Amino acid sequence: MVANIQAYLENLQQPWGQIYYDILFEQLQDIKGKRLLDFGSGFGLVANHLAKDNEVLAVEPNEEMVALRAQDHPYQQFVGSLDQLASLEDASFDVILCHNVLEYVEDRKVILRELTRLLKPGGLLSIVKHNEVGRVLQTVVFENDPQKALDLLAGQDLETHSMGLAQAYDLGAAVEDLALEIQDYQGIRVFYGLQDNRFKGQEGWRESMLQMERAVCQESPYRDMAFFQHYRLKRS
């Protein structure tokens, strides 16, 4: 399946797309005064938001997404992928973001090795990834498709509605031989992905659901059943 960029953009503009960024931005609010790389920056929503208080370089291979990117705050944008990273100096970033990228690539290890090279000692690598438990829960509860959920449990990749196949992976295994240490993780989309979309347009839904997600995002077992998990890793 080829990425459907317009469908992806329309989904982000819905209440259930907007609340994802409400939660993520809160989890990133301590990042200020840093030199930051956003690898796989998409429509530039995170790069643009963080550019208010940071020096940001965004890298994205999809030209259509780059053309539609948010630009309320100044930041540098490269079009490309690993090819754009090769010319960057070692240990040149305080913070690197890689959000919902590694599910869609074959060269996951190569990317992680390159991001580690670019990160300063003590620097932060922020990774948002799919959580297999959360994917199965949403498939059974929201989509009402137990057979698809059984296929996911058997190792089948998830067919996303707009970005193609997403492959589950073990982050601990992916970074075990790199100079990266997992510090903590938080959940995103613990509850709201399980709810029928007809509720999500109701007045006050976004605010009340944000309060609920905020209350449990750092707590197990809730963060362990979230659709997305946001990991913070430190460069040793």
Residue ranges and their predicted role:
Residues 86-95:
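A short acidic, Gly/Pro-enriched loop at the edge of an enzyme's catalytic core
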Residues 1-32, 45-49, 65-68, 126-152, 196:
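Conserved class I S-adenosyl-L-methionine
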Residues 184-236:
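A C-terminal cap/extension of S-adenosyl-L-methionine-dependent methyltransferases
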Residues 43-84:
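Class I SAM-dependent methyltransferase SAM/SAH-binding core
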Residues 95-107:
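A short SAM/SAH-binding and catalytic strip from SAM-dependent methyltransferases
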Residues 109-124:
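A short glycine-rich, Lys/Arg-flanked "PGG" loop and its adjoining helix->strand segment in the class I
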Residues 162-179, 185:
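Short alpha-helix
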